């Protein structure tokens, strides 16, 4: 199958690549089916793209690229909804807000996207803690 994206050109994918989000994601609750693909020539960023709306693609990254000790605790309901039986089946990703000013690029560590890679089910959750920021700087200033 083909997806003609606004910013990344034509992307080929198979049905097995599609991740289902029963609740959609905040701001796009009506969109339920997404694929993930790498940003060309970049090992840190991925694209989280709707296959239902060719204009909706979000840059994402692993939180462990930013915070080595990143840790979340899923609630029982979330574990059940995502059908997670082993933590190895859970992939954690976070959305990135881009800017032409590199110092203003941020990562939302408070609302991770959790994906059961075995079942191809996902959900964006909101962490009820001040430990992580919604706008965490991607690049910290060196002291």
Curated annotation (Swiss-Prot):
PANTHER family: FLAGELLAR ASSEMBLY FACTOR FLIW
NCBIfam families tied to this protein: PRK13285.1-1
HAMAP family linked to this entry: FliW
Protein's UniProt keywords contain Chloroplast: no
Cellular component GO terms held in the UniProt record: cytoplasm
UniProt KW keywords: Bacterial flagellum biogenesis, Chaperone, Cytoplasm, Translation regulation
Record text on subunit structure and interactions: Interacts with translational regulator CsrA and flagellin(s).
Keyword Transferase: no
Pfam family for this entry, one: FliW
Protein name in the entry: Flagellar assembly factor FliW
Location of this chain's protein in the cell: Cytoplasm
Family label: Belongs to the FliW family.
SUPFAM superfamilies: BH3618-like
Function in brief: Acts as an anti-CsrA protein, binds CsrA and prevents it from repressing translation of its target genes, one of which is flagellin. Binds to flagellin and participates in the assembly of the flagellum.
GO BP: any one term: bacterial-type flagellum assembly
Domain of life: Bacteria
Gene symbol of the encoding locus: fliW
């Amino acid at each position: 199958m083909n997806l003609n994206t606004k910013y990344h050109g034509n992307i080929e994918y198979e049905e097995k690549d599609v991740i289902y989000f029963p609740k959609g994601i905040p701001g796009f609750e009506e969109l339920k089916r997404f694929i993930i693909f790498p940003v060309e020539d970049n090992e840190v960023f991925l694209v989280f793209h709707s296959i239902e709306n060719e204009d909706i693609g979000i840059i994402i990254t692993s939180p462990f690229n930013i915070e080595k000790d990143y840790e979340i605790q899923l609630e029982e309901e979330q574990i059940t909804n995502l059908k997670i039986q082993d933590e190895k089946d859970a992939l954690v990703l976070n959305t990135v807000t881009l800017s032409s000013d590199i110092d203003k690029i941020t990562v939302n560590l408070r609302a991770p996207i959790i994906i059961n890679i075995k079942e191809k089910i996902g959900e964006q959750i909101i962490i009820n803690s001040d430990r992580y920021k919604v706008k965490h700087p991607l690049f910290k200033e060196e002291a």
